[in-house]
């Protein structure tokens, strides 16, 4: 587990995406990623504008947005990212052969490679998925892009553990610049081989322990102390009866204090 500061890691990181993210985390004093699963552009933009000051990263499932358009959804989203200084992570979870994911990432309705700083992929189809996604990014935009591999999940009964997780780590090693880290529940090592992977952890809650659909929550202190760099929080920020401003600052503060404790 890394006890170096975000700023120290940013200065040495081989990925411009990871370096930018680590720097803005240091500047804003936040390691909070907001996961906003809402159905309309209006809901999304309103929540993003409210939570923007507290987050380093916005996680989208863009295919949930019923009225999606590049001009109506993506352009104002990017303006808000600039206004509040956060980055965008489209949680697409690619899981096909290289040529197919290349097209899925760059083409179709969503054109993800054009606007998402970061996306993610399963390791189930092998290292070709990394190659395909990287090619799509290079052919689509001059802006740097980063990929997270899904090493572990927070849902009950997940098959992503043991040999599967280790195999995914080996796939990540095939591209030091493009693969910036993992969706995982703990540190994934690699430092002795020269890797500095960012660990982003979903299933983080200060109040709830889970839901009826198999989600399992862990506390902020627990995930950061076991190696998480970025806490991913969804309904805890904006569910019914919650004030996103209050919860945004609450989770930002909890995440930052846990990080400072880890660095001591």
Curated annotation (Swiss-Prot):
The protein's enzyme class: lyase
Pathway note: Pyrimidine metabolism; UMP biosynthesis via de novo pathway; UMP from orotate: step 2/2
An example Gene Ontology biological process: 'de novo' pyrimidine nucleobase biosynthetic process
Residues annotated as catalytic: 93 (proton donor)
Keyword annotations: Decarboxylase, Lyase, Pyrimidine biosynthesis
Cellular component, GO, one term: cytosol
Keyword Lyase: yes
Reactions mediated catalytically: orotidine 5'-phosphate + H(+) = UMP + CO2
Cross-referenced Pfam families: OMPdecase
Positions of substrate binding: 37, 59-61, 91-100, 217, 235
EC number: 4.1.1.23
GO MF: orotidine-5'-phosphate decarboxylase activity
InterPro entries: Aldolase_TIM, OMPdecase, OMPdecase_AS, OMPdeCOase_dom, RibuloseP-bd_barrel
Source superkingdom: Eukaryota
Family: Belongs to the OMP decarboxylase family.
Official protein name in the record: Orotidine 5'-phosphate decarboxylase
């Amino acid at each position: 587990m890394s006890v170096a500061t975000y700023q120290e890691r940013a200065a040495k990181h081989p990925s411009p995406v990871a370096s930018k993210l680590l720097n803005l985390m240091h500047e804003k004093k936040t390691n909070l990623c907001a996961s906003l699963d809402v159905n309309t552009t209006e809901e999304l933009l309103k929540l993003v504008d409210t939570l923007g000051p507290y987050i380093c990263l916005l996680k989208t499932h863009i295919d949930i947005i019923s009225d999606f358009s590049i001009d109506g959804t993506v352009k104002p989203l990017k303006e808000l990212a600039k206004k509040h200084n956060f980055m965008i992570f489209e949680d697409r979870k690619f899981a096909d052969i290289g040529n197919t994911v290349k097209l899925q990432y760059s083409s179709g309705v969503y054109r993800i490679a054009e606007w998402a700083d970061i996306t993610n992929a399963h390791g189930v189809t092998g290292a070709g998925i990394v190659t395909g996604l990287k090619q799509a990014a290079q052919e689509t935009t001059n802006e740097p892009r980063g990929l997270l591999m899904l090493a572990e999940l927070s849902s009950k009964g997940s098959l992503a553990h043991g040999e599967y997780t280790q195999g995914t780590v080996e796939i990540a090693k095939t591209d030091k610049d493009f693969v910036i880290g993992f969706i995982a529940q703990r540190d994934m090592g690699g430092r002795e081989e020269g890797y500095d992977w960012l660990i982003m952890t979903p299933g983080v809650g200060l109040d709830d322990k889970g839901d009826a659909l198999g989600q399992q929550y862990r506390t902020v202190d627990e995930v950061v102390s076991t190696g998480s760099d970025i806490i991913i929080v969804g309904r805890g920020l904006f569910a019914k009866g919650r004030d996103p401003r209050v919860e945004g600052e609450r989770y930002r503060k909890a995440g930052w204090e846990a990080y400072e404790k880890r660095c001591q």
